[in-house]
């Protein structure tokens, strides 16, 4: 949470320290463009890695594949930027991509930490990354008023954390040697492709109603909606921090045949996400107007009524992410694909109906309805998978996961 807060404060300081909004707009553009291709650079390998309970792949192979996807996504990102952005924005986009790339490399090392149940290493790393990159950005931008120089400072700060903290801690468990065969690269590309497409579909669920809102009501309405939505993002992030550390435990329980333990952990996780949502809804009901006024000024207060529907839609998104990731850990990539694609298809008609009827609130209603449709599909597949048990997992990965769980159980 510290890391995300520091990243968010970067967007605040670029406005506070500059004399206009040009650099803020350029930073927002770089974030948006890089975000499009970040999904392909990530290639959903984090969830796959931490649920690799038999250790079929080495950290070097995961790292090699991450470098491969980072390089490929960078080429695509820069081609897209060259076609859609002003020439002076290209360097900023490239630098911000490099900065985010360091974080994606660190994520692979965090996977090793999580597999070995050292979540404290991950927490310390995120704190170091967040604080160091924010301080680097503020100091350099304040001194130079040069956005590119400030992003370079963030890149250097993140790299220092990578080499001085994360790499040494990871190598306490496993030596990191980058390696990737053609066969392994093709295996990763093929296996995780449905999850990547599903992730792209999920990322578009709210983009569609937002774009329609801007088209029909105006960009000012979208700006208001996005500003009010900022505090509610804590629900999505809180949910990820809640279930993320459990994504290696779920497959162990499942492939060991411990259905009762699996169901109990699932129930606790769902209850936890609901609890975070309810707590945030109550807190923001009382301090939402004050928090929004503090962040964006008094002009935003009349739109505080948008907050509760946003909370509902954010919670629905969190459940879509959770059940999708859970099915990936159980090696049901196509089930995850189906749920997210259904959500994407559902949001299209819902967008026209909801935004036309409720304006800004329509974005929340359309997104929530689409996510809940996707969640229903994901739950259908999850119940089906759990009822059939691990013996019905199809494919080499399913067999490997079953064998790994048995080996781990016998070793204990």
Where does each model-flagged region fall?
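Transmembrane helical elements of multi-pass membrane transporters/channels
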Residues: 1-11, 128-129, 133, 150-165, ...
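Membrane-water interface segments that mark the loop-to-transmembrane alpha-helix transition
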Residues: 1-3, 30, 36-83, 91, ...
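Interfacial segments at transmembrane-helix termini and the short loops linking adjacent helices
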Residues: 18-24, 82-96, 219, 286-315
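Helix-loop interface residues and adjacent transmembrane-helix termini in multi-pass membrane transporters
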Residues: 18-21, 86, 116, 143-144, ...
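Helix-loop junctions and terminal segments of transmembrane helices
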Residues: 38-57, 115, 228, 232-257, ...
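Membrane-interface junctions at transmembrane-helix termini in multi-pass inner-membrane proteins
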Residues: 47-57, 102-126, 312-341
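Hydrophobic alpha-helical transmembrane segments
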Residues: 90-99, 123-172, 191, 229, ...
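Interhelical loop/hinge segments that connect adjacent transmembrane helices in multipass membrane
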Residues: 120-125, 147-154, 163-206, 249, ...
């Amino acid at each position: 949470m510290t890391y995300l807060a520091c990243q968010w404060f970067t967007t605040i300081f670029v406005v506070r320290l500059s004399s206009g909004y040009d650099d803020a707009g350029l930073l927002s553009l770089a974030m948006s463009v890089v975000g499009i291709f970040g999904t392909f650079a990530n290639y959903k390998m984090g969830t796959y890695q931490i649920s690799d309970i038999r250790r079929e792949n080495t950290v070097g192979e995961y790292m090699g594949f991450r470098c491969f996807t980072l390089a490929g996504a960078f080429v695509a990102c820069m081609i897209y930027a060259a076609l859609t952005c002003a020439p002076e924005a290209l360097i900023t986009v490239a630098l911000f991509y490099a900065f985010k790339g360091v974080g994606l490399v660190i994520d692979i090392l965090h996977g090793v930490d999580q597999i070995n149940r050292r979540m404290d290493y991950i927490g310390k790393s995120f704190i170091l990354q967040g604080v160091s990159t924010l301080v680097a950005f503020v100091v350099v931008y304040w001194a130079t008023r040069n956005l590119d120089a400030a992003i370079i400072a963030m890149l250097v700060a993140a790299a220092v954390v990578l080499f001085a903290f994360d790499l040494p801690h990871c190598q306490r468990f496993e030596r990191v040697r980058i390696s990737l065969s053609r066969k392994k690269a093709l295996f990763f590309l093929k296996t995780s492709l449905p999850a990547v497409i599903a992730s792209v579909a999920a990322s578009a669920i709210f983009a569609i109603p937002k774009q329609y809102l801007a088209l029909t009501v105006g960009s000012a309405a979208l700006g208001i909606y996005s500003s009010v939505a900022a505090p509610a993002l804590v629900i999505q992030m809180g949910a990820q921090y809640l279930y993320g550390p459990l994504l290696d435990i779920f497959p162990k329980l499942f492939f060991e045949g411990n259905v009762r333990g699996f169901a109990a952990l699932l129930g606790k996780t769902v209850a936890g996400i609901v609890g975070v949502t309810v707590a945030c809804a109550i807190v923001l009901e009382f301090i939402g107007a004050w928090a929004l006024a503090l962040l964006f000024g008094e002009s935003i207060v009349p739109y505080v009524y948008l907050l509760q529907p946003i909370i509902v839609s954010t919670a629905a998104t969190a459940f879509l992410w959770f059940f999708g990731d859970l099915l990936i850990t159980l090696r049901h990539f196509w089930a995850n694909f189906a749920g997210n694609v259904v959500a994407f298809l559902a949001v299209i008609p819902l967008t026209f109906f909801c935004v036309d009827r409720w304006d800004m609130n329509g974005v929340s209603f359309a997104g929530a309805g689409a996510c809940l449709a996707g969640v229903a599909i994901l739950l259908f597949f999850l119940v089906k998978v759990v009822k059939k048990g691990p013996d019905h997992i199809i494919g080499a990965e399913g067999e490997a996961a079953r064998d790994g769980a048995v080996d781990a159980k016998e070793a204990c």
